[in-house]
Amino acid sequence: MKTNICKFVIMAAVACLGFTACTGDLDVTPIDPNMTTEVTPSGLFNKCYANLAMAGNGQGDDPCDIDGLDGGTSGFIRQYWNSNELTTDEALCHWSDDGIQQFCYNTYDSNHPMLNGYYSRLTTGISYCNQYINTFADHDATMTAEIRLVRALEYYMLMDAFGNIPFSTTLANPTRMTRKEAYDWIEKELLDLEPNLSDAKPKTDADLNNYCRLDKAACWMLLSRLYLNAEVYTGTPQWAKAAEYAKKVMDSSYKLNTTGSGKWSAYQMLFMGDNGSTSAAQEGVWRIYQDGKTTTSWAGSLFLMASTFDGNMHADCSGTYPTATNGTGQTWGG
């Protein structure tokens, strides 16, 4: 949405307050008094992560946690991409969904449904994280640091897109925070939580208990990105700090995937459904988990792949140019 902000790293290797959850601020009191609901540390921990991957508690296009958009449209990656790419000359989409053409021609305003959905996705995720931190902060220091990192990312995305933002670290009503104040808080929060994160180490889907969990490299990556655009956010450049934290990631055990497999290049392997079990896994610093079975979305990497292909393109590629296929049977043709 802003052409004067540098793009540094993709937050997923495929490659997140006016609380707006559908039933309020994550009320733990059941709507039906005949039902009881138990909020557990592991359940809420997973929900905080899942806000970046799924629309709600269902799959694909099922009902979502925010109002105004269907499940397939409301996901984090889809609206992050739409708002940052369709508003530039890097991408164009001919779909008639309300909001797409306004993005493409930069005619959006405060009533734009997808911008409102993106805003709500971030603030809803922040409310989940606030509840975890305020309820279960003493349960496990590493888990709490991870959720603080997820919340910091969502505040970063909010600040990056909207400038001045609503801010709260509890479930109380938010106060207004300027972009400079948000920058300062995010920086301090990241530096404070980093020591409690696990050491930087690539993970594969053979270890599902730790796969896609954030570690110190993810924190360094977000710090580097924050510092990279510091001049835009605060008026003061921080190039040396941006380089310092980028180098921490580069010097860690995470590495670029340089080895292809069969007819697929090393780069193509990053976007495949098995990228957690091949050499592509070593590149995934901040993964957003989707297994295509129990954790699915029409707004994640499937959107990035399927929206760029139509049926004719897929048919042509499968014969003459097999390495150009999009790796999925979905062809949405945007």
Locate predicted features.
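Conserved, well-structured interaction surfaces
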Residues: S42, N46-A50, A55-G56, E90-F162, ...
